[in-house]
Amino acid sequence: MRKLLTIFLVLLLAVMAADATRTTITAVAPTIGTAVNGANLWTATTSSGMLLTSIMQGNQLLIINTTVTSSSLWGINLTMKKGVGQYSVLGDKIYTLSRNQTYIIGPLSTSRFEQNNNTFLFDFNASRGKLIAVNLP
């Protein structure tokens, strides 16, 4: 039993260390009459993984703008990581996003993608774009 507990703790620490390398995105909730500098809200996509905080019962949208600075014909793949809810048995969700386009993805399902620590995890296969997360009212 003690050996199993030790193995579990080592695996837990490995998972926690993996999440520490993810870029954290905090969803914004723009309100009427509040000046917001839109340029400061966007976060560059990273291929090392991203983490969305400020979950509000699945009322978030991801707005993703894919950009290509080279002559590449490819866009990016977005993988929403399965969570721990009842629909997590459906697994990860992969979106293929063409280059130089803007996409709105969501509202994000907490019953499929929410993690134990109330976050969403997602990965991009390349760092070609920027995104913003928006909380809906």
Predicted regions and their residues:
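Sec-dependent N-terminal signal peptides
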Residues: 4-14
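Transition segment at domain starts
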Residues: 19-53
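Extracellular repetitive beta-rich solenoid segments
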Residues: 47-58, 127, 137
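Short, well-structured hydrophobic secondary-structure segments
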Residues: 53-76
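Short, surface-exposed beta-strand/strand-loop-strand elements in extracellular ectodomains
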Residues: 69-89
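Intrinsically disordered, low-complexity Pro/Gly/Ser/Thr-rich segments with frequent PxxP/GP/PP motifs
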Residues: 85-116
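Terminal connector regions
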Residues: 113-137
